[in-house]
Design a protein with these regions (language model features):
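Internal maturation/activation junctions in enzymes
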Residues: 1, 5-12
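Charged, cofactor-coupling segments
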Residues: 8, 15-101
């Protein structure tokens, strides 16, 4: 990536969302134009990703590829607890897991 615009070209979503009664639970991120403070008991996701669309000016062999790796994080009094810490994230482990389908 060569410019800030490249980031939005391949990363057209936020970095996460609330988790609760639903996978994409409701809740505001801003209160009075300030980012909401995390409080113990809240659960959020951290999910960077990249998506390569067909209209991008890159080699066609990469068109249609999308990858997003998500962690689910519980906010605690002491900081946080990554609920998904045992989820497979290494590329070799992911490829092995997908080959078993």
């Amino acid at each position: 990536m060569k410019s800030p615009e490249d980031l939005t070209k391949f990363y057209m979503h936020g970095t996460g969302h609330w988790l609760g009664l639903d996978v994409h639970d409701v809740g505001v991120k801003l209160i009075n134009d300030e980012f909401r403070e995390f409080k113990s008991g809240m659960v959020t996701t951290v999910e960077p990703g990249i998506y390569i669309r067909k209209d991008d000016k890159i080699e066609s062999k990469y068109w249609g590829i999308g990858v997003r790796i998500e962690d689910d994080v519980l906010v605690t009094e002491a900081g946080n607890h990554v609920l998904s810490k045992k989820a497979v994230k290494d590329i070799n482990e992911i490829e092995y897991l997908m080959s078993q389908r």
